[in-house]
């Protein structure tokens, strides 16, 4: 943000000093004029509604005042006043949206891949060409926008929102997400109330563990949903899965399932040493989405992907315990967190420090990786556990993961230094010169 606004600008020069992989691609730049003051229509609405979200009618508002509103708002006012606004629709159309951190900023600071910025689902989807009215309450000076995300995409068409009445024309289809990213320590990082009224988009819903709490609520929401994907919002994870797969494997229960995924993330935090950072400063979610192709599992910035048929490996919930199927998801989550130890040749093994820890936490006595006899044989024959200058594809991931895990067993399990890994990760984050081995 600028210290003072600039007036009468005729030219804008964009200077980019750094870029990932020395590559820059500017797809689009948009400019917006910030609204100042209330319009006459908004002043009229405030004579009937308690605020510009038009989500509650003033007790003193008269029928004469209501009838004087534009027809669209008469219907909203009457449904609110008479208590006939459909409860299910209202649950998603009128919501308070929390502030979230900016994931890209924290990815760099924490030596991690970026988490998602799709932390605020609306449960409402739109089609290309739809006209929307979006009514926004006080934003406390924050930048708020709406984004339409198609299926499992990471980004989509974005629409800036001002306080008050916003009239939008949809350029594409997708599920709507509120984009509200700011510094969490700011005194202005407060929830923002938004109303997307009746006939603006279609409600399909989503499950929020903090709000909805029970399997009974989940079952009802899933049955009513109509969109291709159904989103489950946990405390640490977002699961954006094909609705048909949820109906197949988890038709009546989700609380234990999403709680397990939350555990997978939280357990990995125990190794990373983020207690002073999360969630006070950094509160974005890990996004796990099913992908409509024949891929298996992978991890990248903003998302962990599961091929649609790969879901069969770790659903229903029982598989996460009984068949050690938690390894795949935990391995991919580990890819997000391995940056500080992902040395060349170890990209597919250093993350298994985290997945082995997940196995330990769910009560498995045996870790994955080559047995100690193989490690001892390497030492006997003077062979290193990893050749950092060699071809990563020819390296032995089974040996690599054993080395990382043996350090945990020695320092943590044997009680030699129970904070070894958290302290190591903190030092690697705080002094990048300690970690000068190429990543790959």
Regions from the PLM with identified roles:
Residues 39-208:
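Beta-strand-enriched, solvent-exposed domains that form extended recognition/catalytic surfaces
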Residues 24, 434-440:
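Short, intrinsically disordered, charge-balanced linker/junction segments flanking boundaries
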Residues 1-40:
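Aromatic, loop-rich ligand-recognition surfaces of beta-strand-rich domains
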Residues 16-18, 30, 138, 182, ...:
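A mature extracytoplasmic/lumenal domain signature
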Residues 2-4, 165, 319:
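Signal that preferentially marks extracellular ectodomain short beta-strand elements
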Residues 200-223:
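Long, contiguous juxta-domain segments that are non-catalytic but functionally important
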Residues 8-10, 22-27, 130, 174, ...:
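Residues that flank catalytic or metal-binding motifs in active/ligand-binding sites
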Residues 218-221, 228-435:
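Catalytic cores of extracellular degradative/oxidative enzymes
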């Amino acid at each position: 943000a600028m210290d003072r606004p600039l007036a009468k600008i005729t030219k804008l020069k964009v200077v980019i000093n750094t870029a990932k992989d020395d590559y820059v691609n500017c797809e689009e730049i948009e400019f917006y004029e910030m609204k100042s003051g209330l319009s006459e229509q908004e002043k009229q609405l405030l004579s009937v509604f308690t605020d510009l979200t038009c989500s509650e009618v003033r007790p003193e508002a008269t029928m004469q005042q209501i009838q004087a509103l534009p027809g669209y708002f008469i219907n909203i006012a009457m449904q609110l006043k008479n208590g006939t606004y459909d409860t299910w629709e209202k649950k998603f159309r009128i919501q308070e949206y929390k502030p979230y951190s900016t994931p890209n900023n924290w990815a760099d600071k924490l030596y991690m891949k970026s988490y998602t910025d799709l932390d605020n689902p609306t449960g409402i989807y739109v089609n290309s060409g739809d006209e929307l009215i979006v009514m926004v309450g006080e934003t406390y000076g924050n930048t708020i926008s709406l984004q339409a995300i198609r299926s499992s995409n990471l980004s989509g068409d974005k629409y800036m929102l001002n306080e008050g009445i916003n009239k939008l024309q949809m350029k594409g289809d997708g599920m709507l997400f509120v984009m509200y990213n700011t510094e969490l320590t700011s005194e202005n990082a407060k929830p923002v109330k938004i109303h997307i009224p009746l006939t603006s988009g279609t409600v399909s819903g989503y499950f929020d563990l903090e709000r909805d709490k029970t399997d009974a609520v989940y079952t009802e929401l899933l049955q009513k949903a109509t969109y291709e994907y159904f989103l489950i919002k946990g405390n640490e994870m977002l699961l954006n899965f094909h609705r048909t797969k949820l109906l197949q494997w988890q038709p009546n229960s989700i609380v234990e399932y999403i709680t397990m995924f939350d555990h997978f993330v939280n357990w990995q935090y125990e190794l990373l040493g983020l207690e002073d950072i999360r969630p006070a400063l950094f509160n974005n979610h890990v996004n796990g989405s099913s992908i409509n192709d024949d891929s298996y599992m992978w991890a990248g910035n903003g998302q962990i992907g599961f091929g649609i048929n790969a879901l069969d490996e770790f659903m229903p919930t029982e598989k996460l315990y009984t068949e050690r199927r938690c390894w795949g998801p935990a391995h991919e989550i580990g890819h997000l967190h391995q940056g500080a130890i992902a040395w060349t040749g170890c990209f597919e093994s250093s993350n298994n420090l985290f997945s082995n820890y997940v196995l330990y936490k769910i009560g498995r006595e045996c870790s994955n990786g080559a047995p100690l006899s193989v490690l001892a044989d390497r030492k006997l024959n003077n062979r290193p556990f990893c050749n950092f200058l060699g071809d990563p594809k020819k390296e032995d991931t089974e040996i690599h993961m054993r080395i990382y895990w043996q350090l945990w067993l020695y320092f943590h399990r044997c009680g030699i230094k129970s904070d070894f890994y958290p302290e190591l990760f903190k030092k690697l984050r705080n002094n990048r010169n300690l970690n000068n081995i190429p990543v790959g």
